[in-house]
Amino acid sequence: MAFDGQSKGRACIIGAGCSGFTMAKRLKDYGIPYDCFEMSDDIGGNWYFKNPNGLSSCYQSLHIDTSKWRLAFEDFPVPEDWPDFPHHAQLLQYFHDYVDHFGLRETITFNTAVETARRRDDGDWDVTLSTGETRTYQWLIVANGHHWDARVPDYPGEFDGYQVHSHHYRDPFEPFDFRGKRVMIVGGGNSAMDISSELSQRPIAEKLFISMRRGVWVLPKYMNGQPADKAVLPSWLPTKLGRKLARSAIKKRIGNMEDYGLPKPDHEPLDGHPSVSGEFLTRVGCGDIHPKGAIDKLDGDGVIFKDGTREKIDAIVWATGYNVSFPFFDTDDLRAKDNRFPLFKRMVKPGYENLFFLGLAQPLPTLVNFAEQQSKLCAAKIAGEYDFPPREEMEKVIVEDEKFHLGHFYDAPRHTMQVDFNAYVKDLMKELENGRKRAKATA
């Protein structure tokens, strides 16, 4: 049965992380037939520590920076005895409990990767698996994540010591022993905050530097005695005013970054993806972490910085982000350019209305239950309950949405997919309602 834009057909889900299995649950609820392929031996994706597929970026000490109050699935509450910020093992167990509670495990095909996905002339998708088999689907749902294809900047010179991207960092001792070493972390995101705080402890690194090309605002995990993300501004408050009030509260709470010896940010709080840490600023203030500016070049057993200074370095951890990649597509239309991949409601590329990207965003405060919301529109479309607007309108909405969600962020690869979770979901539900009206009008 070829894709005709209306008939249910069969769906293929690529990946069984939190985006993939919440989509599977939604399709199961609708009674829509689907296959879900996971290249690893179990669910969890990025939150599966030491995932045998090599694509997890979990390190042993990792706790999620989103509080339990904001990451719970709608119909499956988190355990009452959880701490405010659960460890990755607790989050993974929550995922397992969800999958087993809703009977999803038997619907997932493990140890099977999607090698290629090609759109046919009739609109269907030919999906070739690592088993060598090719199957045809009317709907394709991509949930392969965007925190696995590590990006390492290219600097002149050579470095003779140990190098690792934060994606492959696991703990201070294995696979590399950082004890007694002069270590440099490169980057200013959450992984950089966590790993520098961990390795800077005196029994571990002899000396730890952090190199940032630009200053960032490091936000606390707690404000006024509660998780910072638990405080939600009233929904009636205009977005710009809410952002202004939040900025004022942040500055009052943490002061100026340069007062800690860090580079002065060239932007306001919340004009960049927040770096969140309850420990980093204290370790900088205690002299355990030594801030440095941008790298000029690598220099054998050391690094030369833009200000002309040089530091002897034994090991570098590159906490420099990720590329957005879809290795199973072979058409330029479906490749991200400079990490930019504009989509209608962060889900659909106009002209490919039977292809959905789930979880392909950097939502504040969390990605964990983001696709659970997206799956509502996706399933409604497959079930014939929702219709997209005309292509021209979809293109216009993409531009408007990107201006709304990205307009206040400084230009950087990490800011190509930012969305405000609450504003996004509110707008998505409005679009879902409008699309249902369109579907009824043409029925």
Protein language model regions, located:
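Flavin (primarily FAD) cofactor-binding/catalytic cores of flavoenzymes
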Residues: A2-S61, P77-V216, K221-Y222, S235-R391, ...
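Short, mixed-charge aromatic SLiMs
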Residues: K396-F409
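Flexible "cap/lid" subdomain of the alpha/beta-hydrolase fold that forms the substrate-access gate
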Residues: H63-T66
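Aromatic- and acidic-residue-enriched carbohydrate-binding clefts of CAZyme catalytic domains
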Residues: W69-R70
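Conformationally flexible catalytic loops at phosphate/diphosphate-handling active centers
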Residues: V232
